């Protein structure tokens, strides 16, 4: 087999792998909902929705909508930090962020990041700048989520979780938090060991990331925005709990948020749908909450953030990023 044949085989394999993985995630999502529907819970869920206090639901929706420009602001910090000689204005970033969040809701999360990278590359004529800024944005957002989840596991409200699950989760999240911080702090040492190695290019990128995160105002600013973004999501969880008259305190909402979102980012279902509902239903059962109410609560969380992302669908249809001269910094 010649080189060209091998390359064609690789490309063909990649073309098959993507749809296959998406199909498997769809099967997992559908399987979870079939499991939940086995007792006809969905008919009872409709009754729960009918009695929900839509003033609280509106507050949750407002929190979800407000996240979009905040995520855009955080991402723009990285976009402009990667190439400080030129600046991208906020409005194209808001538009692209809205589009990416929409695709992330209806497809695997990586699809949203892929769309963001593609559209920003069309705007800036730089794939490197686009991909690097998206990776930084995603990495910081996930790291803050890990930290919040770790804190949540030590709140008194988390003591109602099964001890084994709580301790294992704390160990995993703690390890991730320590490894992430250590990798960032030790980047110069790691990079020096990779000089002359084929991974030296990655070392240069890592040094750039460390400089942005630790040696400029961009890192602290993006960190602050990340905590606000996740804080809004926690408030949305609390508001939805109040809308359905669930006996959950704000502290319990922090714990529930950590469980819901950490499960949602596990790449085994479409946008976390299905697996999130199963986990929340089982978790709230420990609080004595009826399964149909727990399912309605979890679905409402997904619906609220899906509704907040819907403007991104319209923007996707209307927005056409065209390369234009960027403002000098």
Language-model segment annotations:
Residues 80-82, 116-124, 284-286:
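Helix-loop junctions at the membrane interface of multi-pass solute transporters
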Residues 90-92, 112-113, 124-139, 289-300:
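Membrane-interface alpha-helices at helix entry/exit sites of multi-pass transporters
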Residues 1-98, 155-265, 291-299, 303-329:
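Predominantly cytoplasmic-facing regulatory/coupling regions of multi-pass membrane proteins
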């Amino acid at each position: 087999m010649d080189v060209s044949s091998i390359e064609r085989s690789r490309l063909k394999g990649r073309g098959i792998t993507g749809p296959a993985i998406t199909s498997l995630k769809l099967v997992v999502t559908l399987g979870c909902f079939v499991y939940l529907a086995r007792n006809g819970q969905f008919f009872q869920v409709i009754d729960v929705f009918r009695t929900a206090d839509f003033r609280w639901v509106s507050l949750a929706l407002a929190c979800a909508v407000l996240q979009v420009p905040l995520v855009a602001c955080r991402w723009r910090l990285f976009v402009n930090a990667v190439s400080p000689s030129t600046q991208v204005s906020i409005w194209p970033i808001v538009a692209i962020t809205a589009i990416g969040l929409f695709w992330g809701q209806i497809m695997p999360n990586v699809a949203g990041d892929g769309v963001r990278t593609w559209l920003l590359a069309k705007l800036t004529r730089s794939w490197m700048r686009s991909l690097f800024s998206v990776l930084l944005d995603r990495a910081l957002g996930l790291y803050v989520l890990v930290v919040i989840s770790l804190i949540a596991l030590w709140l008194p409200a988390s003591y109602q979780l099964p001890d084994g699950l709580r301790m294992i989760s704390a160990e995993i999240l703690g390890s991730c938090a320590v490894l992430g911080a250590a990798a960032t702090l030790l980047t110069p040492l790691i990079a020096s060991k990779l000089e002359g190695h084929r991974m030296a290019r990655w070392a240069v990128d890592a040094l750039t990331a460390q400089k942005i995160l630790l040696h400029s105002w961009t890192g602290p600013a993006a960190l602050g925005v990340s905590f606000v973004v996740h804080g809004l999501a926690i408030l949305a969880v609390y508001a939805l709990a109040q809308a359905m008259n669930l006996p959950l305190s704000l502290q319990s909402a922090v714990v529930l948020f950590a469980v819901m979102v950490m499960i949602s980012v596990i790449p085994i279902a479409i946008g976390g749908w299905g697996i999130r509902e199963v986990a929340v239903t089982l978790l709230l059962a420990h609080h004595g909450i009826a399964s149909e109410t727990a399912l309605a609560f979890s679905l409402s969380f997904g619906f609220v953030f899906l509704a907040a992302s819907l403007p991104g669908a319209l923007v996707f249809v209307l927005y056409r990023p065209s390369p234009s001269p960027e403002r000098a910094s």
